Amino acid sequence: MRYHGICWFIFQAAIIFAIFGSCQGAFRHQFKTAEQDGFARRNRDLAKFQKENLNWNGLFQLNSISYNSGVVSGVFEQQSENGENQHLFPFSISFLKNDVVRFQMDEKSRLEGTVEYEKNILTKRRFDASTELGFNERAEVYGKDAHLLEQTSTSLTIRYGSHGRFTVIVTFSPFKVEFQRDGEPQVVLNERHLLNMEYYRPKSSRTPEQEANGMWDETFDNFHDSKPKGPESVGLDIKFVDYGNVYGVPEHTSSLSLKETNNSDAGYTEPYRLYNVDLFEYEVDSPMSQYGAIPFMQAHKPNSDVAVFWSNAAATWIDVEKESGPSPHSQSTSTHWYSESGTLDLFIFLGPKASDVYESYSALVGRPLLPPLFSIGYHQCRWNYVSEEDVLNVDAKFDEVDMPYDTIWLDIEYASKRRYFTWDKATFPNPKAMLEKLDSKSRKLIVILDPHIKNDPNYFVSKELIDYNYAVKDKSGVDNYNADCWPGNSVWVDFFNPEAQAWWGSLYEFDRFESDKNLWIWNDMNEPSVFRGPETSMHRDAIHYGGWEHRDIHNIYGHKCINGTYNGLIKRGEGAVRPFILTRSFFAGTSALAANWIGDTMTTWEHLRGSIPTVLTNGISGMAFSGADVAGFFGNPDAELFVRWYETAIFYPFFRAHAHIDTKRREPWLYGEPYTSLVRELLRIRYRLLPTWYTAFYNSHTHGFPILYPQFLMHPEDEEGFAIDDQFYVGDSGLLVKPVTHPSIDKITIYLADDEVYFDLHDHTEYAGKGHQVVPAPLGRVPVLLRGGNILITRERIRRAAELTRNDPFTLTIAVSKIGKNASGFLYLDDGVTFNYKKGEYLIRHFSYENGILTMKDSHSNPPVSPKYSSSQKHLKVERINIYGEQTRKSIKIRKIIDSEVTEWDVSVDDSGCIRNPQLFLV
């Protein structure tokens, strides 16, 4: 079937669209729709053809298949369009550790290098993102838990998994792979026969029809893409059986539960797109690309989760469609994934719980980082603080108005002529002295350093980059890729060259960049952003080290940039100190290296609302340390929006105020009273909760969990909450947050998923009963409820900066459950700075309350506890205990269990439910 011919009509329509554009979004015309992206158009046409020809069995036939030692191996074959040649595609289905299955497919001719390109500098094989990113090292085949149950002439069945609950059924013709759990289908590959891998064609064989379909070159927005390797897209349909809600594939401003992309009333007309771009003043509620790309999708139904990870670094689109499920009144979700180039590399996770999915997925791509303590405090930024005097005045003003904060940031104007790794000495004559003054208060400075380098022979970074041949090349493969960015004419670091990445890291050394130990890094514009480039980015036919076109690696360019920065900062700190990096661009695994923010928001209520599902989606997809600019990057918020955004942002994992250079100054005291006092108290709430936040980050680091739990994750059985994305929990602390995101209201409705009792964190009011509850929400009071059955751990003493709290005592707030009158919680502690926690220098204390007994237990796990560190923390204690939900209790027993030694004593409870100075020390 010559599927390329199907799209001729759509191609003509795309030309009309390109001429007349769209009236939605001020800059939408700069970015491709699926119909304007040749490979996307071809794959969507394939899907359209399948719907119109239901008896069609796909492009491929099975040539051979076998099973041995945990791997199904086989070969597909496909006839060329003229019927003269047979093309072979080896594939495998591998059974890995952690109950993960991997489906891979490649193209024999490119894999073996028998193809011929006009440019000999190009690598002949397809790009393998998993190899480049180190995923293969963690994707170990583990055949011990995989057993061939049956092989016939038509199918092959394998049982796998540590508990033997999972089954894979491979049907030979037409080819289909069904994944079952406990005998029930969960995920099906190629049910619609949309498996596609465009085979190599000599350019001399091209036809006018292929030219029209963008197979050999394309022009968009007057930018020409030469496509010297011809068509090489990959595609596959993936069905989530009996799952009506799917989540993930950030970064988008869509809802948490992904919408359909088939023109349905509640959905979109475009697929979700993964192509990292510099998208300013972006639309809310859109499947358009943003700054990051994680091709991870999770499906959820009552008490069941599955997921897939599509390991591909090229431009990718995902169609989502709902259909009737196998159960009465149920839905299944059919998805169609297609990427411009690369291999087909899919990982399948069958849960059954979300925690199982996150454990296995993060073990593959890398656990989220455990950040330094200061970085989960408050960050003050704008474009730009204009001088040392400006920086130090802002710093002093925070102390004057008694507001805590941890970092102040410098945007591009600090650097001489925007030449990174330099200082404008007219405005920053003595940066080290400035850093020392900040350090005296345990505060940090974070500066922007972007991967575009001013093309200037008198600039040492530019000279070295060019002299060492470390820059990205244009399509010739000889000349450096030159274009404009913030410094004017620029060249870009080629982070795919290991030597270039190491050189980039060396620029952070103290003898190369005038700085100090309390200076950390912001890598922006690393999509990469290119002014007046195609779709605000680099030409897809630019060439990177190794002979890869930019199209092959685009979505991981930012990740490789961050990898170089991270390694450089590790070396700068002699391997002892945890770095802090903020990135705008990201991919799967970037969370092991950096935090991110969601880019150039606008100061509107709509953008405030949209930030919540975006941050939630980033989190469940692995990018846990995420946040949005307070109170929007573009524009000047009124006082109400300003305060409401702070109310929301104190519950982002990453909490930073930032604003455009053309906005009015908006440090948190500039709106005057009563707003200054309102924001002050909001900042203090964030700092009181630092122990809770840090413990949530520890859980994320050790298990891959998000920092913020969506409703479906906290209440996996409650179908009413599966699509809720305007409220969330802070880790497993029991804190339920419902930000106010509309103007002129003083109360809000919170959805409670169960009959448990919930306590208002502000005045301890009790709410109970499944359903919607109305709670007060005057300006400055963010609605936060503490769910019964939890123990909240805080530090009530407010210091200038987070690190200054490390010796302060703790407060326990015990919210007893409705049934059983019990509660639990736990606390993680380390020095908040170094990697010494890997040597056992940390404390974990588990608290439980039942029958009037509060038990504190040492829950330290591997590596063994460091006696020296433990001894150094003997001063830490609980100074106060609050009990909610047991108004009549007059005393409780405290039980302390450390190293199997049990100590008990009784303490009195006053009429307010408070125990002061209970003499409970952590060690």
UniProtKB/Swiss-Prot annotation:
Note the superkingdom of the native organism: Eukaryota
Asked whether the keyword Signal is assigned, the reply is yes
Sites carrying a glycan are 262, 563, 822
Indicate whether Thylakoid appears among the record's keywords: no
Which SUPFAM superfamilies does the record cross-reference, listed alphabetically?
A: (Trans)glycosidases, Galactose mutarotase-like, Glycosyl hydrolase domain
Entry-linked InterPro entries: DUF5110, Gal_mutarotase_sf_dom, Glyco_hydro_31_C, Glyco_hydro_31_N_dom, Glyco_hydro_31_TIM, Glyco_hydro_b, Glycoside_hydrolase_SF
Q: In which pathway does it act?
A: Glycan metabolism; N-glycan metabolism
Signal peptide start and end residues: 1-25
Q: Name one GO molecular function term.
A: Glc2Man9GlcNAc2 oligosaccharide glucosidase activity
GO CC entries:
endoplasmic reticulum; glucosidase II complex
> Which terms does the UniProt entry file under GO BP?
carbohydrate metabolic process; N-glycan processing
**So what does this thing catalyse?**
N(4)-(alpha-D-Glc-(1->3)-alpha-D-Man-(1->2)-alpha-D-Man-(1->2)-alpha-D-Man-(1->3)-[alpha-D-Man-(1->2)-alpha-D-Man-(1->3)-[alpha-D-Man-(1->2)-alpha-D-Man-(1->6)]-alpha-D-Man-(1->6)]-beta-D-Man-(1->4)-beta-D-GlcNAc-(1->4)-beta-D-GlcNAc)-L-asparaginyl-[protein] + H2O = N(4)-(alpha-D-Man-(1->2)-alpha-D-Man-(1->2)-alpha-D-Man-(1->3)-[alpha-D-Man-(1->2)-alpha-D-Man-(1->3)-[alpha-D-Man-(1->2)-alpha-D-Man-(1->6)]-alpha-D-Man-(1->6)]-beta-D-Man-(1->4)-beta-D-GlcNAc-(1->4)-beta-D-GlcNAc)-L-asparaginyl-[protein] (N-glucan mannose isomer 9A1,2,3B1,2,3) + beta-D-glucose; N(4)-(alpha-D-Glc-(1->3)-alpha-D-Glc-(1->3)-alpha-D-Man-(1->2)-alpha-D-Man-(1->2)-alpha-D-Man-(1->3)-[alpha-D-Man-(1->2)-alpha-D-Man-(1->3)-[alpha-D-Man-(1->2)-alpha-D-Man-(1->6)]-alpha-D-Man-(1->6)]-beta-D-Man-(1->4)-beta-D-GlcNAc-(1->4)-beta-D-GlcNAc)-L-asparaginyl-[protein] + H2O = N(4)-(alpha-D-Glc-(1->3)-alpha-D-Man-(1->2)-alpha-D-Man-(1->2)-alpha-D-Man-(1->3)-[alpha-D-Man-(1->2)-alpha-D-Man-(1->3)-[alpha-D-Man-(1->2)-alpha-D-Man-(1->6)]-alpha-D-Man-(1->6)]-beta-D-Man-(1->4)-beta-D-GlcNAc-(1->4)-beta-D-GlcNAc)-L-asparaginyl-[protein] + beta-D-glucose
PANTHER family this protein is in?
ALPHA-GLUCOSIDASE, BCDNA.GH04962
Q: What is the annotated quaternary arrangement, including any partners?
A: Heterodimer of a catalytic subunit alpha (gls2) and a subunit beta (gtb1).
Q: Which function does this protein serve?
A: Catalytic subunit of glucosidase 2, which cleaves sequentially the 2 innermost alpha-1,3-linked glucose residues from the Glc(2)Man(9)GlcNAc(2) oligosaccharide precursor of immature glycoproteins.
This protein's name: Glucosidase 2 subunit alpha
